[in-house]
Amino acid sequence: LSIRRQRQMCIRDRHYDIIHFQWPEEVVGWTCNDPDIIRRLEERISFFRSRGARFVYTRHNVRPHYANGIISRAYDIIESQSDIVAHMGRFSRDEFLTKYPDSQNVVIPHHIYQYTYKEDISVERARQYLNLSQDAFIVTAFGKFRNREEIRMVLGAFRAWDEEHKMLLAPRLYPFSRRNSYGKNFIKRWISKAGYYLLMPLLNRMYKLQAGANDELIDNCDLPYYMAASDVIFIQRKDILNSGNVPLAFLYHKVVVGPKVGNIGELLSETGNPTFDPDDKKDILRALEEARRLAAWGQGEVNYTYGMENMSIRKVGQAYAQTYKQAING
């Protein structure tokens, strides 16, 4: 037998009390386009359930950002077949109940990232490491900018913001690349490289940005320096359910400003952080100005205390352990 076949047989022979789904894409493949995978997923769930397994699903997304029909169907199956669904906020739970009124649900917050990154980094040391101004008021937007709407929203508001020492730190802003991302399409490849080497430096100087290409990941060793160097963390999504950048910012004692949507808007409002209407530039400017004041008043310390009391790994882990017991005991 092949090694792969032996592994498959070994998995089938095991007994599991709990199977915990995090990302349905991870089960079927992040770019899956095989229609037969849906049948196999349903069969596998039925098989393990027949052997006494119970299923828990943590709802990170309503649907993936780039989902196809097969992945969306996988979401439907896992949502409907799970014995308990864990949500990171009441917003998600209430929305889910409208679709699955008979489902069992629990609310468990996203954990803060204790013991994951270097935490004892001063603002001065972080800015020195990243070669950033010690005097700038730095607003950081983490993560890949997914579309032009997010770019326009952030750049439009930031350019209009009347803050003399402002700097936008956006490591994955621009849709350009120095890599051969377009294969044999010479024109697109040339435009992308020209944007990377010529337009990016020009725009950074013009608009007080420290921004990079959206296909270049931040090294995990560098990530805590970006966080520590910031005054405010900006969540640049227009439509999103959860963001790990919020608990990460809380761990680093930072103020967070984000859209008034999903679990994010709920958490930020409850903790005294500014929220905004993502389609209203004036409202974004108001939120940025409020974030600047809150940073000076110590809201970052309030966020850290809240995170440690309500989102610690220990507390979140205990909540999931209780959820597993609930699933097993029915």
Model-based region annotation:
Residues L1-R7, I11:
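Single conserved hydrophobic/aromatic residue that forms the stacking wall/gate
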Residues S80-L97, P101-K118:
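Donor nucleotide-sugar binding/catalytic pocket of nucleotide-sugar-dependent glycosyltransferases
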Residues K118-L132:
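A short helix/loop element that forms part of the nucleotide-sugar donor recognition site in Leloir-type
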Residues L132-E149, L155-F158, L169:
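Conserved donor-binding/catalytic core segment of Leloir-type glycosyltransferases
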Residues R178-Y225:
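Nucleotide-activated donor-binding/catalytic signature segment of Leloir-type glycosyltransferases, i.e.
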Residues I235, V255-G258:
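Short hydrophobic beta-strand element within catalytic cores of glycosyltransferases
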Residues S269-K282, E289-A296:
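Conserved acidic donor-binding segment of nucleotide-sugar-dependent glycosyltransferases
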Residues K282, A295-N329:
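A charged, aromatic-enriched C-terminal amphipathic alpha-helix characteristic of glycosyltransferases
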